[in-house]
Curated annotation (Swiss-Prot):
One of its GO terms (biological process) is tetrahydrofolate interconversion. The keyword Transferase applies. It comes from Legionella pneumophila subsp. pneumophila (strain Philadelphia 1 / ATCC 33152 / DSM 7513). Homodimer. Its main location: cytoplasm. (6S)-5,6,7,8-tetrahydrofolate binds at L121, G125, H126, L127, S355, P356, F357. GO terms for cellular component: cytosol. The record marks H229 as: Plays an important role in substrate specificity. One of its GO terms (molecular function) is glycine hydroxymethyltransferase activity. Pfam families: SHMT. This is Serine hydroxymethyltransferase.
Length: 417
């Protein structure tokens, strides 16, 4: 039925051009969005495989459809590798995304209207941690904690006071824009004081956790969620982990299926299995060490150029640049740096006076640039280029000069050679 003539190129010119243009953009731009990375050709191969054809409601060995014996192998591989990677007793690889993983955990542990606590979005949290525009803030009563306005660090004493006041049923420890180590033991202590479940969302730092460069929450949290992309460098998807607890495990399984989802995406699960196998290799730890070194180098260079970093530094792959004292908005900075072929994202900073559509900060991350092969030398050059642009976001001649340098560096370090 299908032969090699069935290609997008020969069928859909508009879509083919969009894909080709995106491939060129990835090669000709330096990616500094903290939540993005480049997957390996092996991951791409799995995700584009015939496993996309197979419907497989249920779990390995307990499917509602026949013909699942081979996709069962893929899912069992993903599960066993994730258990080994994170030291977890239970793993569910079926969530389509990190947000759906978080939603499944909440469905398993909470009832509509229950109170839970999460980090405020402007302070570095995530939409699913209680934002009023998200399901988490609509279906449940969310109480937000934040960072100290002077230090930029989580104020655990204030968090504890809020917990004692509101008696949440669940506390979420996690972030999308926080550059420091979370004190899992303190979170556990606070949760125990009020009889709350503790959920850790490690979507941003999962790769660092997997190799021991960031403390693991698995021994402390009742449930851990993550995405499988970002620092983990796998396909876009979600993952749920926990230590041994038969009651919670059963709740999580039924919450994911049939509670949240129908058929799992078996081609994505196969891609997760490949990514987890890659993450178990010694070179993955070397990569994560470089991610961390690059983030610290970027932080140091930008500080030397007069830019404020929220919390004063970084312990992971990201940093949050506070532009309030520079008199420019995150939106302006994002656009200007983008014109130099450096991709970043505007981001709110703690106590930001501007709206989330404008913001007063930039979030920068090093996972993708490190995958590309950048080390301290390249990151130093790159960080200075970012500062050059930010020094005058309206100087198009300077932006053009930086863009030329970016293109030369991109050719030296292709993504897919």
């Amino acid at each position: 039925m299908f032969d090699e003539s069935y290609s997008i190129k020969n069928f859909d010119d508009v879509l083919f051009k969009a894909i080709s243009d995106e491939k060129r953009r990835q090669e000709e731009h330096i990616e500094l969005i903290a939540s993005e990375n480049y997957v390996s050709p092996r991951v791409l191969e799995a995700q584009g495989s015939v496993l996309t054809n197979k419907y497989a409601e249920g779990y390995p060995g307990k499917r509602y459809y026949g013909g699942c014996e081979f996709v069962d192998v893929a899912e069992e591989l993903a599960i066993s590798r994730a258990k080994l990677l994170f030291g977890a007793h239970y793993v569910n690889v079926q969530p389509h995304s990190g947000s759906q993983a978080n939603a499944a955990v909440m469905m398993a542990l909470l009832s509509p209207g229950d109170t839970f606590m999460g980090m405020a979005l402007p302070h570095g949290g995530h939409l699913t941690h209680g934002s009023k525009v998200n399901f988490s803030g609509k279906l449940y009563h969310s109480v937000e904690y934040g960072v100290d306005s002077n230090t930029g660090l989580i104020d655990y004493d204030a968090l504890e006071k809020l917990a004692l006041q509101h008696k949440p049923k669940l506390i979420i420890a996690g972030f999308s824009a926080y550059s420091r180590i979370l004190d899992w033991a303190r979170f556990r202590e606070i949760a125990d004081k009020v009889g709350a479940y503790l959920m850790a969302d490690i979507a941003h730092v999962a790769g660092l956790v997997a190799v021991g460069l960031y403390p693991s929450p698995v021994p402390y949290a009742d449930v851990v969620t993550t995405t499988t992309h970002k620092t983990l460098r796998g396909p876009r998807g979600g993952l749920i982990l926990c230590k041994e607890n038969e009651e919670i495990e059963k709740k999580l399984n039924s919450s994911v299926f049939p509670g949240m989802q129908g058929g799992p995406l078996m081609h994505v699960i196969a891609a997760k299995a490949v990514a987890f196998a890659e993450a178990l290799l010694p070179e993955f730890k070397t990569y994560q060490q470089q991610v961390l070194a690059n983030a610290r180098t970027m932080c140091s260079v930008l500080q030397s150029r007069g830019y404020d970093i929220v919390s004063g530094g970084t312990d992971n792959h990201l940093l949050l640049v506070d532009l309030i004292n520079k008199g420019i908005t995150g939106k302006e900075a994002d656009a200007a740096v983008g014109r130099a072929n450096i991709t970043v994202n505007k981001n709110s900073v703690p106590n930001d006076p501007r709206s989330p559509f404008v913001t007063s900060g930039l979030r920068l991350g090093t996972p993708a640039a490190t995958t590309r092969g950048f080390k301290e030398r390249e990151i130093t050059l790159l960080s200075n280029w970012v500062a050059d642009v930010l020094d005058n976001v309206h100087d198009e001649t300077n932006i053009s000069r930086v863009k030329t340098q970016v293109l030369l560096l991109c050719r030296e370090f292709p993504v897919y050679a």
